[in-house]
From Swiss-Prot:
Function, in words: Component of the ubiquinol-cytochrome c oxidoreductase, a multisubunit transmembrane complex that is part of the mitochondrial electron transport chain which drives oxidative phosphorylation.
Gene, per the UniProt record: QCR9
Organism of this sequence: Kluyveromyces lactis (strain ATCC 8585 / CBS 2359 / DSM 70799 / NBRC 1267 / NRRL Y-1140 / WM37) (Yeast)
Main location: mitochondrion
Similarity-based family: Belongs to the UQCR10/QCR9 family.
Any one GO CC term of the record: mitochondrial inner membrane
Domain of life: Eukaryota
Localization, UniProt: Mitochondrion inner membrane
Protein name, per record: Cytochrome b-c1 complex subunit 9
Segments on the Mitochondrial intermembrane side according to the record's topology features: 45-69
Coiled coil: none
């Protein structure tokens, strides 16, 4: 039995199985793509994101600032 025949019998023969396969594949692809893009974005913008600068801002900011008197 060829691969195409097996694929047809398991996925494409019944519309309900085909639609379920499409939805499941889209869900898995979306999760993997989102994780990959988020990881790339956070690495590309390291030091500029809120989670990176939050501690400095919440603790009063930088110590190098001088008051104008």
């Amino acid at each position: 039995m060829s691969f195409a025949s097996t694929l047809y019998k398991t996925v494409f023969k019944r519309n309900s199985v085909f639609v379920g396969t499409v939805f499941a594949s889209a869900f898995v692809f979306q999760a993997a793509f989102d994780t990959g893009v988020t990881s790339w974005y956070e690495n590309h913008n390291k030091g500029k994101l809120w989670k990176d600068i939050k501690g400095g801002i919440m603790n009063g900011g930088e110590e190098d600032e001088e008051d104008d008197e």
